[in-house]
Amino acid sequence: MSSKCDVVVVGGGISGMAAAKLLHDSGLNVIVLEARDRVGGRTYTVRNQQVKYVDLGGSYVGPTQNRILRLSKELGLETYKVNEVERLIHYVKGKSYPFRGPLPPVRNPITFLDLNNLWRTVDDMGREIPSDAPWKAPLAEQWDQMTMKELLDKLCWTESSKQLATLFVNLCVTAETHEVSALWFLWYVKQCGGTTRIISTTNGGQERKFVGGSGQVTERIKDLLGDRVKLERPVVHIDQTGENVLVETLNHEVYEAKYVISAIPPVLGMKIHFSPPLPMMRNQLITRVPLGSVIKCIVYYKEPFWRHKDYCGSMIIEGEEAPIAYTLDDSKPDGSCAAIIGFILAHKARKLARLTKEERLKKLCDLYAKVLGSKEALNPVHYEEKNWCEEQYSAGCYTTYFPPGIMTQYGRVLRQPVGRIYFAGTETATHWSGYMEGAVEAGERAAREILHAMGKIPEDEIWQSEPESVDVPAKPITTTFLERHLPSVPGLLRLIGLTAIFSATALGYLAHKRGLLVRV
């Protein structure tokens, strides 16, 4: 006996729940099937006496992320700003350098030129890539055959620049530079608003968090949908051979629907049997796009001692020996539950996963004591962590990445419906893909695709722009005249070379005119 509905949504993360809410609000009968014993997907808010609440998964929102801001406001949630009042720290080669702004200042003029050219070039290349179709970029094939390591080797002339750029890639996509396609990474940064927007706290992707935790987004939608959300229901079979679509779960329940939305990471499609089989390109796509590797770590202290030293808690930490590459203050908005959140990224996550939780905590505290110059870092009162690599219904975090050669070959089928199955998930977004914002965009777009298929809305209403948030307005990202026009290192060398040639020629001419050159 099967349960009948209009639409089955596979996956109760933000994307699936946003899709379900829109369909429900449109008058459709929708059922959400979630594999875990909770909703939220890659967002996960834990609550206990020591921390009140803590986001162990996706957490940050900021300017230009207007869909998640609109949805959360509709659900009654509020945001607060992540602390960045005091100074940040750049830790490199065993020394701490305090600074203010999104990126650490550079003291070596050659390194400054090198980094300035790198950020400028990454943004310039991104502008050539269509957000909705990166495979259509003029040089898509060439860039997709290149790893980010190869691109950085071409662009960076100094080792300092290359190391900071590598950290930037690790932090943005939780993968190594040799693992990801240059085309895909350039697209990823572009659709997040560029290098400054994606990395910044103030006026950037990490500006805010939700009071009470991001897990409330899906929890409150679940409250609205009631028993239409079914937990602990991993989907194992989707059958489109009949008049309606039959969706079977691991516990042998069958749900019958007119349409299905798959709101899970593409690779998790391999856990589902499809009848008829998936088309060739979709079938191969889902075997080729892994997720990144990250362990999210939150260390709690008696008080935010770093603020007493005029540090805000944000640290950019270079070096292979450092377990953490990036931190932020994770204290509550009222100052309680003082905490520093850090990210163990990419290969370091895989390496340090072998240690015990206690061993990881000790490494973190030792590192923070060095970077902050304070033994108070050695005295935590509590510790929370989440290794997303071991989650069988996520397969990693933050998001899916594309290795070289995959985007141009398979990217165009990422959002392409398969019969009556439509695809959501943050990976399918065109703006802030990889973030909660992208999850909302994708879920609502997939829902409107079904509304269009049912004849309820015209095709031109499937994709909709979003008005800017009144509560979290965006400031434009600006660059100085020098940042726009300073030469790269090779440009400077060419300039010096041309200047030397011109000077030598001029001196030779003057010497000749004055009879100083003697013919031998």
Curated annotation (Swiss-Prot):
The keyword Transferase does not apply. It comes from the Eukaryota. Residues 517-520 are mitochondrial intermembrane. The modification S-8alpha-FAD cysteine is found at C397. GO terms for molecular function: flavin adenine dinucleotide binding; monoamine oxidase activity; primary methylamine oxidase activity. It is found in: Mitochondrion outer membrane. It is an enzyme of class 1 (oxidoreductase). The modification N6-acetyllysine is found at K52. The modification N-acetylserine is found at S2. It catalyses: a secondary aliphatic amine + O2 + H2O = a primary amine + an aldehyde + H2O2; (R)-adrenaline + O2 + H2O = (R)-3,4-dihydroxymandelaldehyde + methylamine + H2O2; a primary methyl amine + O2 + H2O = an aldehyde + H2O2 + NH4(+); benzylamine + O2 + H2O = benzaldehyde + H2O2 + NH4(+). Its main location: mitochondrion. Keywords: Acetylation, FAD, Flavoprotein, Membrane, Mitochondrion, Mitochondrion outer membrane, Oxidoreductase, Transmembrane, Transmembrane helix. Its EC number is 1.4.3.21, 1.4.3.4. Residues 2-489 are cytoplasmic. Catalyzes the oxidative deamination of primary and some secondary amines such as neurotransmitters, and exogenous amines including the tertiary amine, neurotoxin 1-methyl-4-phenyl-1,2,3,6-tetrahydropyridine (MPTP), with concomitant reduction of oxygen to hydrogen peroxide and participates in the metabolism of neuroactive and vasoactive amines in the central nervous system and peripheral tissues. Preferentially degrades benzylamine and phenylethylamine. This is Amine oxidase [flavin-containing] B. The lineage of its organism: Eukaryota, Metazoa, Chordata, Craniata, Vertebrata.
